[in-house]
Amino acid sequence: MGQGVSSGQDKKKKKGSNQKPKYEPPVQSKFGRKKRKGGPATAEKLPNIYPSTRCKLKLLRMERIKDHLLLEEEFVSNSEILKPFEKKQEEEKKQLEEIRGNPLSIGTLEEIIDDDHAIVTSPTMPDYYVSILSFVDKELLEPGCSVLLHHKTMSIVGVLQDDADPMVSVMKMDKSPTESYSDIGGLESQIQEIKESVELPLTHPELYEEMGIKPPKGVILYGAPGTGKTLLAKAVANQTSATFLRIVGSELIQKYLGDGPRLCRQIFKVAGENAPSIVFIDEIDAIGTKRYDSNSGGEREIQRTMLELLNQLDGFDDRGDVKVIMATNKIETLDPALIRPGRIDRKILFENPDLSTKKKILGIHTSKMNLSEDVNLETLVTTKDDLSGADIQAMCTEAGLLALRERRMQVTAEDFKQAKERVMKNKVEENLEGLYL
């Protein structure tokens, strides 16, 4: 029986030894493995195909490259061809400068005789019969233009295309003044008249066409000194977008014969080129006084300047959108031909301000001042005070200076009182001086 048990155990061992071991997958290594960049959709994409054989796409590409290479070759060849011409052109320019010489004189072309000769003049020399060199552009030559003259032979060697006088360029205001209608105390009727005469024709000319009337050509502002004539002109320049030329009458009086009328012509020429424009002539009585027989050359030159101004105001040439504003203190001394209707259609009078206007002017000038509590603006001006707008401004300035003298940052009523006494004293002295003139 013992043998039977042992034999049964041996059979079990043999059966166990004949069974195969269970498969176990190897451990995955963490090193040397590349991550897949795409998921399962990568296998569905079409591969990139590059034409490496003769096909239509490659042929088109090569033709485009050929076109670019041919264009580059043509550009290089043209550059090589143009080099001698550029060099020759520089040499010709040097020869031209040598022929012209240096320095050059400036003259005025009076008359063209023929294609090769002309008559020129200048304020510092007599008239000359000169030749016109062949390289001068004869299409630019016209009577009255400025030409360049050789300093020895006086031949015409060039034309000044921009023949505007530098003084005219200075007269043109690039920046509009800061004054506006709100800075003017009173003068409601004067502001309304100048708007109707100057502003409205430039901004809405169709209104005058519908009415069947021609807008005024110009206005003259006259009245006592310091009543706001120039201030109103500055406000007009601020309100409108038109070109504004400011001239003082004395600037039209020049030293040499003919310079005054020429400057007057150039002023209106520049105004016409930059239309719409406004020409403001301050102190017009400097050249616009009544004419009389005089043996003085200076007086006759002033009269010629005024005649040129009359021609520009009401000549054969239409001035278009060019308006004229004049200002003077003595309208009675002006020539009647200057201020007649047709040249100056409106005469606007500026009188000394009344009591309410004086208070408005005082309020404008004291609006930015640091006043003390004892200042009463209502009592500073009265009806009896013969004060103009400029006098009130001078009074406010003087009061501020008195406060600064005493190291104070506030202006008191006593400062205004002393300032008013000083201004009134100066006015009395000016009136007394006028009695002996």
Curated annotation (Swiss-Prot):
A lipid is attached at G2 (N-myristoyl glycine). Keywords: ATP-binding, Cytoplasm, Isopeptide bond, Lipoprotein, Myristate, Nucleotide-binding, Nucleus, Proteasome, Ubl conjugation. Coiled coil: none annotated. GO terms for molecular function: ATP binding; ATP hydrolysis activity; proteasome-activating activity. There is a cross-link at K234, K255, K290 (Glycyl lysine isopeptide (Lys-Gly) (interchain with G-Cter in ubiquitin)). ATP binds at G223, A224, P225, G226, T227, G228, K229, T230. GO terms for biological process: nonfunctional rRNA decay; peptide catabolic process; positive regulation of protein catabolic process; proteasome regulatory particle assembly; proteasome-mediated ubiquitin-dependent protein catabolic process; protein-containing complex localization; ubiquitin-dependent protein catabolic process. Residues 1-47 are annotated as: Disordered. The keyword Ubl conjugation applies. Changing K229Q: 73% loss of ATPase activity. Disulfide bonds: none annotated. PROSITE patterns: AAA. The 26S proteasome is involved in the ATP-dependent degradation of ubiquitinated proteins. The regulatory (or ATPase) complex confers ATP dependency and substrate specificity to the 26S complex. Has ATPase activity. This is 26S proteasome regulatory subunit 4 homolog. The gene is RPT2.
